[in-house]
Design a protein with these regions (language model features):
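N-terminal active-site segment of His-dependent metallophosphoesterases
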Residues: 1-49, 53
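Residue-level marker for buried hydrophobic side chains located in beta-strands
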Residues: 4, 30-32, 58-59, 125, ...
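Active-site-proximal beta-strand elements of phosphoester/diester hydrolases
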Residues: 1-9, 123-130, 215-217
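His/acidic metal-ligating clusters that form di-metal
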Residues: 99-132, 136-195
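Catalytic metal-binding/acid-base residues of hydrolase active sites
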Residues: 9, 37, 63-64, 130-132, ...
Length: 241
């Protein structure tokens, strides 16, 4: 089975609770669509486990990009700090220099967009916040795009705004060659989105637009306490709190 999750934000215990719930095994594949680190208690512990896994595929999020930028340019640190870097820094700087280098090197090599995943006859395009504004049919990495496009792919809030319908139309036209491509993102918590849904207690739920080809999996784990996971084989949803 193939699963996707996003925006775990250092919640190591909740992540393992979810793996237990879906009965995740060596025969399965898990895509993590950005934002493993920051805010929660064990971001580096979680990241190291994902790095060592053979069947977990990590797609870069804006929080990992902030970490990379801060390592290169100290002037970028304030932005990272204001977005919850403290737990990540605490764990990261307790590691050896070699281990720190290994982590940064891993993140530099992570994809930012995977447009061609086919599961049970359905095609999926994965990116943390936004698809690229032009057609792609292969995995894209940080160094493949300009800084502006990198920012848009990892940081865009356009799918949160009321005018997201126009973007959905643009996306649908761009990928009409596939007829049935579904874009899956995170980044914007579903309770904050114009198309988002919640449970009876205000907890986030995996949300989609009316046509179903835009899906957001960021249930706001660090805010609402809900971590959601989508199984792509049959589109079944799983949640832990």
């Amino acid at each position: 089975m193939t699963y996707i999750i996003s925006d775990i934000h250092g919640n190591y215990d909740k992540f393992h609770k979810l793996l237990y719930k879906i009965k995740f095994s060596d025969a399965d594949t898990l895509y993590i669509n950005g934002d493993i680190i920051d805010r929660g208690p064990n971001p580096i512990k979680l990241l190291l486990e994902v790095m060592q896994s053979k069947n977990m595929i990590f797609i870069l999020g804006n929080h990992e990009e902030m970490m990379l930028e801060s390592a290169i340019d100290a002037s970028c640190y304030a932005t990272w700090y204001c977005n919850g870097s403290t737990p990540t820094e605490k764990e990261f700087y307790s590691l050896s220099f070699d281990k720190q280098f290994t982590i940064l090197d891993f993140l530099k090599k992570c994809p930012i967009a995977i447009p061609n995943i086919v599961i049970s006859g359905k095609q999926f395009y994965l990116a943390h916040a936004m698809h690229l504004p032009y057609y792609i049919n292969e995995t894209i990495y940080r160094n493949d795009v300009s800084k502006k496009l990198l920012w848009e792919t990892l940081w865009s809030r356009q799918y949160k705004r009321p005018d997201y319908k126009q973007l959905v139309i643009t996306y649908h036209d761009l990928y009409s060659i596939y007829h049935n491509t579904t874009f899956i993102c995170g980044h914007n918590t579903t309770p904050s989105c114009s198309y988002g849904i919640t449970d009876s207690h205000g907890g986030g739920r995996i949300s989609k637009n009316m046509s179903g080809h835009l899906i957001n999996t960021d249930c706001g784990c660090y805010k609402t306490g809900v971590l959601g996971c989508l199984r792509l084989d049959d589109m079944q949803e799983f949640y832990v709190q």
